[in-house]
A protein has these predicted regions:
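Cytosolic, long alpha-helical scaffolding segments
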Residues: 1-403
Length: 403
């Protein structure tokens, strides 16, 4: 239930931002439907935790689960608030939609054409997260929506796929779907930067930072890493500061326009991004305070659709000495790089120009089927124990692990 709740809350956020990007009320209503399922899961998990706590020691361990459950619920509620910007027509400046195409993870939609490489094939067969670095968050077939896709789901001509991921994979994605070439929304460049421009730039940054904070928070829980927990708290502080500046810029911009109504959505989006950051900090509080973590947390978070992995860079590996841009991690492996650990410090959201070195540790999140590709890029082979199912990194060309 915990892994399903995590996946559901992340799907809700993806759909909510996509609804804003495409101005699609039907997609926003799907977020409300998912919120009902998330509420049921949260209620059931709380009941299970109460029943399982039979001693003070059990209560301490279950308290950590309840803390994470509450944080996941907050993320889902923030997604609902984002969706309401569309359903309640609060207004969004068109410049924001164009700027969202420059976010670290972008929304895209494409229709599957007859005769294309996707038509009549399963999602598992197409392997979009690995092939193009984008994941399907929803499918619209005629008037029906599908949000709980399994690997055996067959794509049919006419299906409209809504995806989230690296913008670099859009061109290849459209080739696979048989769709025409896509031109991204134009971002008008103006020498004079207005308060509205500043607010929009800050909001896109808040979206990026809040999503990274959640990824790092789950990583901190799985790895029990104090350093990651501290980074999450730092990011949450940045979100607070950005929200305060954004509110000032929006007020100034509204004063200069006859109709300030399109600016209401900006304030709501900023509040939702900050709430997501607060939820991330709520999770890492457990790590920072040294609270006992129930083993189910690591198991459940590791069984989610997207897993958190830590892979070191081996000397002489394909990644050693290369910049992130030409490596194309997201499109080649499907994994999104959250941070690099170098010399005991974390470099989160590294720029494409950052050059990887032997000894760096990559902290990334993505589909489990791409884990071996990331390992190979870093000079390792991923070996799975037949009996326990545990995975181990072995240097490429090295001896097999002892059993």
């Amino acid at each position: 239930m915990l892994s399903e709740a995590k996946d559901t809350s992340e799907l809700m956020v993806d759909l909510a931002y996509a609804a804003v990007y495409f101005g699609d009320p039907a997609m926003a209503e799907e977020v409300d439907e998912l919120e009902q399922r998330l509420s049921e899961l949260v209620h059931e998990m709380r009941a299970v935790c109460v029943l399982a706590a039979r001693s003070p020691r059990d209560a301490d361990a279950m308290a950590s689960v309840l803390q994470v459950v509450g944080a996941i619920e907050r993320i889902g509620n923030a997604a609902v608030d984002i969706g309401r910007i569309v359903t309640h027509r609060l207004g969004i400046p068109r410049a924001l939609v164009a700027d969202l195409s420059r976010a670290e993870e972008v929304s895209h939609r494409v229709r599957v054409r007859e005769g294309s490489a996707m038509a009549h094939r399963t999602l598992a067969d197409v392997e979009l997260p690995v092939e193009v670095g984008m994941r399907v968050v929803a499918i619209r077939r005629d008037r029906d929506w599908v949000t709980d896709m399994e690997g055996e789901h067959v794509l049919l001509p006419g299906d409209v796929l809504f995806l989230q991921g690296a913008a670099a994979g859009i061109a290849e994605l459209r080739v696979l779907a048989g769709a025409p070439e896509w031109e991204p929304p134009e971002v008008t460049e103006d020498a004079a930067v207005s308060d509205l421009d500043r607010a929009i730039d800050a909001l896109v940054e808040m979206k990026n930072v809040s999503e990274v904070a959640v990824g790092l928070a789950y990583s901190a829980l799985v790895l029990r890493d104090q350093g990651l927990a501290a980074e999450v708290s730092h990011l949450e502080d940045r979100l607070d500061e950005m929200k305060e500046r954004l509110e000032l810029w929006v007020l100034r911009a509204a004063h200069e326009h006859l109709d300030p109504s399109p600016f209401r959505g900006l304030v709501h989006l900023a509040q939702a991004a900050e709430e997501i950051g607060d939820a991330a900090e709520q999770m890492v509080w457990l790590v920072q305070e040294g609270e006992a973590l129930h083993p189910i947390l690591a198991l459940a978070l590791g069984a989610a659709d997207e897993v958190v992995v830590r892979v070191p860079v081996a000397p002489g590996s394909p990644a050693d000495g290369r910049a992130l841009a030409p490596l194309r991690l997201e499109t080649e492996t499907g994994f999104y790089l959250l941070a690099i650990r170098r010399g005991g410090r974390y470099l989160y959201r590294p720029r494409p120009s950052v050059v990887l070195r032997a000894g760096d540790e990559l902290l990334a999140t993505g589909p489990d089927e791409g884990h071996h590709l990331l390992a190979e890029m870093c000079g390792y082979t991923l070996i799975e124990d037949d009996e326990t199912g545990a995975e181990e990194l072995v240097p490429s060309g090295g001896p097999p692990p002892s059993r």
